[in-house]
Every structure is written in structure tokens, then in C-alpha cells.
Amino acid sequence: AWRFYTIPGPGEPGNDTWADDSWMTGGSATWVTGSYDPELNLIYWGTGNPGPDWNGDVRLGDNLYSDCVVALDADTGELVWYFQFTPHDVHDWDATQIPLLADTEYDGEQRKLMLWPNRNAWFYILDRETGEFLNGRPYARQSWAESLDENGRPRRVPDTFPSVEGTTVSPSIGGGSNWFSPSYSPLSDLVYVTAYDGETTYFIRDDEYIAGERFTGGGGTTPLPQDSYHAALRAISPQTGLTQWEYPIQPRSTAGVLSTAGEVVFGGTMDGYFYALNSSTGEELWYVNLGSRVHAGAMSYAVDGVQYVGIAAGNVFYTFALDD
């Protein structure tokens, strides 16, 4: 029916944000599911990092529409608005995450919001009708941006780009969070995200583009053991972007988060634990070790009036329900 290119070609708005012909090998892939608002008839989709990942010298400019959320007319594919989280991304943080859509109060009035704990460690509050930037705060450790300006554009800390010798920056190469889904509960009016406070030493190198081969322009190493960093499930206010409570996780987690109408939040850990928390307070309600890493997000469904919660761990799918 239609197709939208996440890198604009010659003569299209945004192509001038790519130096020379770098747009032709620019990346900006979409590899995580987006969201849809039926009232606005808009599709929201996050885009990937520009290429090569870490050496931005060969692609000077903001590199649109990489590291963006794009709002598209569902009937035509026409771009209605976009917001770029990390212009000229040189740390492979991208924006391939699931947009959270929330109808809640902001600054004294009901708004249609988009809530986004980005991999770059900043939490963004946007108006999803217009793309207007409303607020942004760090939700995980970060050392690359001093602040965001009135349009949400980062004010970068000097000397945080990758280098030949290596530059240590937070968040880590895996980000403050990643593809694992966050969740919003209208009951508690909180956003839940699996967060990670780490750092990476980022390097650059000269890579020649060869079709079908890796084209990264560098990489990264973790300067300290990963268990020396801090991971947590964090509950964030959609009005302020401030963390209201956190549930520490050790070791880190790559599992998605599920919040339910029973005011319970479910998550998992890399050492095999599946846990349930009170969504308002973060109090631990119960946990169980499933014997394999939990990388998936939980799901909930009902059969014959009974609610079940399911989670995959390893090659097994587990189902839980309350006793009669």
C-alpha cells in the first residue's frame, strides 16, 4: 500500500543532514515493532542508528531519520512529524524501542503523550499529536549530554565521541535500556523500565563499506566487570520524568516489563528469576527461579474467567495463576 524510507534520498527533506553520499550506506533500520493510535490514525515507529555505528567522521550531520521516532499517516505513509533523540549518533544507541502511548495529565491538562525511556539514558515526554517535546530527564547513568534544550536537542559534553585510543562514556554500549519493552500503567500513572547504569570505552576505526559485510567503524569494551554496575527496574513519573522507586536487579536484566490491572508489575532477570512487584510501591510480592535466563517479556491472558501470566525462559514457556 505504501512505503516510508527512513533515510531521505536526494531532493527530499533531510537528505542534506548526510555528508556527500553517506546516506547510501546510512543504516537507520527499523527492527522493533512500533505503536498505533486509532484515534489519530498515526503509526509511531522507532529507527535505528546511522552507519557506520561509531565512526561519524564519514557521515557528518544529524543523519535523519536515524535515532528518531517517526509518526506516519496509517493510510498513506506520509510523514506527519518526527523527533530525533540522538542527532549524529556515534555510540550505537539508536531508537528501536516500543513507543509508549499514554492519555494522562500533563501540566494541568489532559494530553496524548508519548513516553520514551531511550537507550541514550534520557527519558522523553512528547505530545504524540504534534511531536512537541515537553520534558526530558536522565533515568539511567549518562555522561554524554549536559542537558536538553527547549526542543529536546542534547547539549553534548565535549570529548565524549569515540576515539582511536578509546573514550569511556555512559550509558554502556547496551544503553540505559534497550529493545526490551517498557510498560505504562494508567492505574498508577507510572512508566516501568528495565534500566542499567554502566559505561563503555568506545573506539573508532576506518572501515570500508563492502555490501553484505559488517560496517561498524569501531566498537566498544566494558572497562569494569559488568556485575560492578547497577541494574534496576525503575518506575518513572510521566509528568516529571523523575524516578519514583526502583527495584534493584543483580545481575542485569534484558527482559521486558508487564503491568496489569491488578496493580502488579512482572519482570525477569538474566539469572533466571521471574518476579512480581506492587506497581505503586515497588514492594516485592513473590519471585521464582525458572532455571534459565529470562529475556522475554511476560504476557497475560484469561481463559474461562481465570487470569494467567506467561513467561518464556530458555526453551520452556511457564504459566502462572492464582489459587482458587
For the regions a language model picked out, list residue spans one by one.
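Extracytoplasmic/lumenal domain signature
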Residues: 1-24, 39, 56-95, 102-110, ...
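Active-site cores of enzymes that catalyze phosphoryl transfer or operate on phosphate-rich substrates
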Residues: 35-41, 47
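Short, well-ordered beta-to-alpha junction loops that form the rim of enzyme active sites
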Residues: 6, 47-49, 195-197
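Active-site core of glycosidic bond-cleaving carbohydrate-active enzymes
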Residues: 64, 115, 187-196, 250
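Short alpha-helical segments and helix-capping/turn motifs at coil-helix boundaries
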Residues: 27-32, 109-110, 121, 175-181
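Long, low-complexity segments enriched in small/aliphatic residues
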Residues: 35, 159, 165-200
